[in-house]
Design a protein with these regions (language model features):
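Acidic, glycine-rich two-metal-ion catalytic cores of nucleic acid-processing enzymes
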Residues: 178, 182-278
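N-terminal leader/targeting and assembly helices and adjacent pre-domain segments
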Residues: 1-178, 274-281
């Protein structure tokens, strides 16, 4: 029906990879403060016999104090990461999404400016994602404190010969995050999925708004994984190499974590209104 757009330069995913990799690396390093603190406390407990004695009490207090110090350091570091990601990185990613679309439309990057509509869009996205991330951080802190309470409770059990270090780690795995379905996932896997979702959503929102506001485009061409659905990965309405209205693209900038979706401008369809959103190329 129409001729597909030929990309000019790097794909959106290639342009975002540096932001995603850097953010995941920084988040991983911040989280390592927490996991190392847990390991140090468990190692300290391994050399302490549960029960009440002056020697045991002093060693336990020192180990707990060290854990609390590390917990505070984790909270500061990961909180600073979330602030930088929301306040600095996401606006840069938004601009990158706009620039990528303009490059593919063979328009100057200076066509994009921080209009009120763009500012409103990035402010809403940044605020939403900051809340999401800080909620995850608060949950990690809650779980860390639960682990500490469990260790303290075990220390009072004089009937124990030794702390069951393996049991404490198994019941309180601080190197994981817990999803809504109660499934535990490694921090690294969660971090990459969350950061990628937020980055691609932000960039594609910018691309869609730039299409509409700066170029007056009604339709964008979708490039995505061959098996990816439009609303979610299993949606039988396939996304790749279809035409979508800009409004539909704003409603579904991504379909799932690690989504490869990219919006390409259809300058040749400006003024057309008779194409059904979802039409195949």
């Amino acid at each position: 029906m129409t001729t597909p757009v030929r990309r000019r330069g790097r794909t959106l995913r290639q342009r975002l990879l540096g932001y995603i990799t850097d953010a995941v690396d920084r988040l991983r390093k911040a989280w390592s403060i927490l996991t190392l603190a847990q390991t140090r406390l468990l190692n300290a407990l391994a050399g302490i016999r549960p029960g009440f004695s002056s020697g045991t009490g002093a060693k336990l207090r020192a180990a707990i104090a060290a854990f609390n110090t590390s917990l505070a350091a984790f909270a500061r570091t990961v909180g600073a990461w979330a602030e930088r990601w929301a306040a600095t990185d996401l606006p840069l990613i938004y601009r990158e999404g706009a620039w990528t679309l303009l490059d593919n439309a063979d328009r100057r990057q200076a066509t994009f400016t921080w209009t009120q509509r763009h500012q409103t869009a990035i402010t809403a996205l940044s605020a939403q994602y900051y809340v999401d991330l800080t909620a995850r951080i608060q949950e990690a802190l809650r779980r860390a404190r639960a682990f500490l309470r469990a260790a303290q409770d075990a220390s009072r059990d004089a009937g124990r010969g030794r702390f069951d270090i393996a049991e404490l780690r198994e019941q309180h795995p601080l190197d994981t995050v817990v999803y809504a379905n109660q499934a535990r996932h490694p921090v690294d896997a969660w971090a990459r999925a969350a950061v990628t979702w937020q980055a691609v959503t932000t960039a594609n929102t910018a691309a869609a708004r730039t299409s509409m506001d700066e170029l007056g485009i009604s339709y964008v061409e979708i490039r995505d994984g061959a098996d990816c659905g439009w609303r979610d990965h299993r949606d039988p309405d396939r996304a790749d190499r279809t035409l979508r209205t800009v409004q539909d693209a704003l409603a579904h900038p991504v379909a799932h974590a690690h989504c490869q979706r990219e919006l390409l401008p259809r300058m040749d369809l400006i003024g057309r209104t008779n194409i059904m959103s979802g039409a195949e190329l």
